[in-house]
Amino acid sequence: MAEYEVVIGLEVHAQLRTSSKLFCACSTEFGSEPNTNVCEICSGMPGVLPVVNRKAVEYAVMMGMAVDCTINNDSVFARKNYFYPDLPYGYQISQFERPLCEHGHLDIPVNGGTKRIGITRIHMENDAGKNIHSAADNASYVDLNRAGTPLIEIVSEPDMRSAEEAVAYLKELRSILLYLGICDGNMEEGSFRCDANVSLRPAGQKEFGTRTELKNVNSFRNVQRAIEVEIARQQDLLEDGEKVVQETRLYDAARNVTASMRGKEEAHDYRYFPDPDLIPLHLEDGWLQEWRKALPELPALRRTRFMEQYGLSVQDAELLTAERELADFYEAAVRHGGVPKKVANLMMGEFMRELNERRISVNEAAMTPEAVAELVRLQEEGVVSSKIVHDIFSDLFTSGSMPEAYVKAKGLVQISDSGAIETAVDEVLAENPAEVEAYRGGKTKLMSFFMGQVMRKTRGKANPAVVTGLLTEKLG
């Protein structure tokens, strides 16, 4: 790839977490029966007038502020004209010449440092409905529940140079949306989705190459794979002396290929013009001040603070601050007396494993920050071993029990009395004379075997440090 430079820009659509749609009072609840959250406005009936959802405007502005955009006090809604069965108006209400937010940036973590990605604009628009194709009765249906749901489109500058950078940008953007509480970030349900514009140009050339737009990328993994596949496809074309066609391509995850969908539209193809049913949107300075004050501590600042305040590594801080609820949980556990690094290790290991296996969020977990802090303390004080922590964690996670009471009730308090442990050590050595001889002959890896045997005799309750000391002493 030394001969060519990759150029990537992303268009991200984020569905705003308002209770009602952008221009009417219909619910935005996901999963309702088809065509139940629909009225005359969002179904495009003639003679009705849209009214802007103030909360959606607030959310869009907060996102703009979070990425250091210029917020335009006056912006204009425009009609984006195209035909599709799930678009009841025959056009989409969007913004074109004067968007709500523009000229921002986002710093993303790259190779232990940061890289600044420019953000061209953030504008508001209403979502389309959903086409449902049924093979059983050879028919297509339209569900308008999603039609009119408020979206923001976040358009980046073409500043990314690899698929890895594109994924890092998306993850950082999603974290900000989650911290603000304005989008649930669910890529599978389509509430956070992106189109990737990919092109190649000869290394050192300033002029951009012909770009393609990639669609149907509904996970971070698929974003990376789709971009990598498209880069390879374009490189093969250029090396064979062929031209890249400007088009929209669909990513097929099963086959790991991109396929042509249609020619890539330009702005003039949509015949944008100001929507005559909506007056220009004017924002009072007082509103902007109020919304700026409501901004939380954002992921980048919190990441830096976690490293400075708690002594965490870059990787640990990145993982723990990826979602606001996870970072809040961690800090609550530390406030309850948990050693910061030990709490981090437990949360990134056992805690995250349970969340992922059960596919639940932090807020849905029965386990509390107090319980995590108490479990860390018990291990630090030698009351329980790391093995016992591993063995009981799933029960604690699902039951919400406090660790100290649980351990005592189950008789799992760690044995640290050297006399009791010495008895078990002597029995193990007496039962395994061949292994003892082999160890003394140089096969020191057998230490783990002896450790396992002693732990089995004590049902995992022996203090590992005491066991190691006694074995080392007796094996010479």
UniProtKB/Swiss-Prot annotation:
Q: Known InterPro entries for this protein?
A: Asn/Gln-tRNA_amidoTrfase_suB/E (IPR017959), Asn/Gln-tRNA_Trfase_suB/E_cat (IPR006075), Asn/Gln_amidotransferase (IPR018027), Asn/Gln_tRNA_amidoTrase-B-like (IPR003789), GatB (IPR004413), GatB_C_1 (IPR042114), GatB_Yqey_C_2 (IPR023168), Gln-tRNA_amidoTrfase_suB_CS (IPR017958)
* Gene3D superfamilies in alphabetical order: 1.10.10.410, GatB domain, N-terminal subdomain
Q: Does the keyword Ligase apply?
A: yes
Q: Which UniProt keywords apply?
A: ATP-binding, Ligase, Nucleotide-binding, Protein biosynthesis
Pfam families in the record: GatB_N (PF02934), GatB_Yqey (PF02637)
What functional role does this protein have?
Allows the formation of correctly charged Asn-tRNA(Asn) or Gln-tRNA(Gln) through the transamidation of misacylated Asp-tRNA(Asn) or Glu-tRNA(Gln) in organisms which lack either or both of asparaginyl-tRNA or glutaminyl-tRNA synthetases. The reaction takes place in the presence of glutamine and ATP through an activated phospho-Asp-tRNA(Asn) or phospho-Glu-tRNA(Gln).
Species per Swiss-Prot/TrEMBL record:
Oleidesulfovibrio alaskensis (strain ATCC BAA-1058 / DSM 17464 / G20) (Desulfovibrio alaskensis)
Keyword Protein biosynthesis attributed: yes
NCBIfam families in the record: gatB, PRK05477.1-2, PRK05477.1-4, PRK05477.1-5
Assembly description: Heterotrimer of A, B and C subunits.
The molecule here is called Aspartyl/glutamyl-tRNA(Asn/Gln) amidotransferase subunit B
